[in-house]
């Protein structure tokens, strides 16, 4: 079996986790108490969903997941919520005082008190797996726990499970709306620390998702529940191939192989279609060509940046539902003829396709309509550098005045870490710039470098 362990860190991670596991349970027909009426083999069994759920002798299905937060309130909601019987109490780990939006607290002072307990629990989960494939880490960049504790955890996971893939789903600070003033600091510190430990990071920006909710689902004031349910559909599409049998299956390592041309350039852009409310879906039939085209609209992206300003390095299309390869090939051929989509010249083909026959599931009482087919596109494009540039600029404005830095230094960080992290980010921007250059332009100055 190719099991995956999900780790949900901090408030954002835990709330995304709630939405994801709610959806997984609906997709597999697992009840909130962990029973699965449709599953005839009690205990074990080699069903595809066992990648995400372990099965007890009593026929209960337990998520292979850990929820961690440095303060109890968010996890207490899981402990008392609808799915309280789904999780093992030891899978929900909470500390007593929070990281107060401070990376240094999450990474050094408070994080280190809880890290061993978390790793211990991870080890137990990993021992239950026959062929652990990797970890999915859900967190935000802006919070103290999401940034600081995640980077600490990733460092430790690299030591303990060096060869296993580690994928991140990260909430990236939105360009306009902000939940904390020090978001740019936390984001840049965490990106710098986790860059070498993460194999692939899918970024999601709240503002982009707010806009999608407003525009496509007609929700005037989207709540975090609305946002998370939309994110969970994307996560579900990405992991569907691990949990169901399909025509063209994609496994975790396969994402990396196809999406990450260079180890540092591992930030694919996620796009999902169709995002449509029940009222509208009733009146239109969305063809494969239509949903494929929708994926190339900047409006449907999960991060605010414009791929028309960048070049694509790789592109992964994950279809689910009533889709046949013939339609997909036609849709891709049509897209390749459009000139607005530019690939880097060293990557001519660039489309990887996964097809899964399980149609997308709609959460009852949710905003998304039940549709016959959906697609999630993961593309590695140089345009995402815009997002980094935006963040770096905010960091520079604050750091020039050394604003708020004393909070970090007071928790045992050194100021040098800030400048080191910032230099790393500058290097990352440069990497993206160089990857986008045409290969023949870069030939003449090759001689000097080596």
UniProtKB/Swiss-Prot annotation:
The short sequence motif called MREC motif sits at 1-4
Question: GO biological process: any one?
Answer: microtubule-based process
Sequence positions that bind Mg(2+): 71
Q: Which cofactor does it need?
A: Mg(2+)
Coiled-coil residues are none
- Could you tell me which residues carry N6-acetyllysine? 40
Answer yes or no on keyword DNA repair. no
Q: Which family does it belong to?
A: Belongs to the tubulin family.
Write the protein's name.
Tubulin alpha chain
> What is the species listed in this Swiss-Prot or TrEMBL entry?
Notophthalmus viridescens (Eastern newt)
């Amino acid at each position: 079996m190719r099991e995956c362990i999900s780790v949900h860190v901090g408030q954002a991670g835990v709330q995304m986790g709630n939405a994801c596991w709610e959806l997984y349970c609906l997709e597999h027909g697992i009840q909130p108490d962990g029973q699965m009426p449709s599953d005839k083999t009690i205990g074990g069994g080699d069903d595809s969903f066992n990648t995400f759920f372990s099965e007890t002798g009593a026929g209960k299905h337990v998520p292979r997941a850990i929820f961690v937060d440095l303060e109890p309130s968010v996890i207490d909601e899981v402990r008392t919520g609808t799915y309280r019987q789904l999780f093992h109490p030891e899978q929900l780990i909470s500390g007593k005082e929070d990281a107060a939006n401070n990376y240094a607290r999450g990474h050094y002072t408070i994080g280190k008190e809880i890290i061993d307990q978390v790793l211990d629990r991870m080890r137990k989960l990993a021992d239950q797996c026959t062929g652990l494939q990797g970890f999915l880490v859900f967190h935000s960049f802006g919070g103290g726990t999401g940034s600081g504790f995640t980077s600490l955890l990733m460092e430790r996971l690299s030591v303990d499970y060096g060869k296993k893939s580690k994928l991140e789903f990260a909430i990236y600070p939105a360009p306009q709306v902000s939940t904390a003033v020090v978001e740019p600091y936390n984001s840049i510190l965490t990106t710098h620390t986790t860059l070498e430990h993460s194999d692939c990071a899918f970024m999601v920006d709240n503002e982009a998702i707010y806009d999608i909710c407003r525009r496509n689902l007609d929700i005037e004031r989207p709540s975090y529940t609305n946002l998370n349910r939309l994110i969970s559909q994307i996560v579900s599409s990405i992991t569907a191939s691990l949990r169901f049998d399909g025509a063209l299956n994609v496994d975790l390592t396969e994402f990396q192989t196809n999406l990450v041309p260079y180890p540092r350039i591992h930030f694919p852009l996620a796009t999902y279609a169709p995002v449509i409310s029940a009222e509208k879906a009733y009146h239109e039939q969305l063809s494969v060509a239509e949903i494929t085209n929708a994926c190339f609209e900047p409006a449907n992206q999960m991060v605010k940046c414009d791929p028309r300003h960048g070049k694509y390095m790789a592109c992964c299309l994950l279809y689910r539902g009533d889709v046949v390869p013939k339609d997909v090939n036609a849709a891709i051929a049509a897209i390749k003829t459009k000139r607005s989509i530019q690939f880097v010249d060293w990557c001519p083909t660039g489309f990887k396709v996964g097809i899964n026959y399980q149609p997308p599931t709609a959460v009852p009482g949710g905003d998304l309509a039940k549709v016959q087919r959906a697609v999630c596109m993961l593309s590695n494009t140089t345009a995402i550098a815009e997002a980094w540039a935006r963040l770096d600029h905010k960091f520079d404005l604050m750091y020039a005045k050394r604003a708020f830095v004393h909070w970090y230094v007071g928790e045992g960080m050194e100021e040098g870490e800030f400048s080191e992290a910032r230099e790393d980010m500058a290097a990352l921007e440069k990497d993206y710039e160089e990857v986008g250059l045409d290969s023949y332009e870069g030939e003449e100055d090759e001689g000097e470098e080596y």
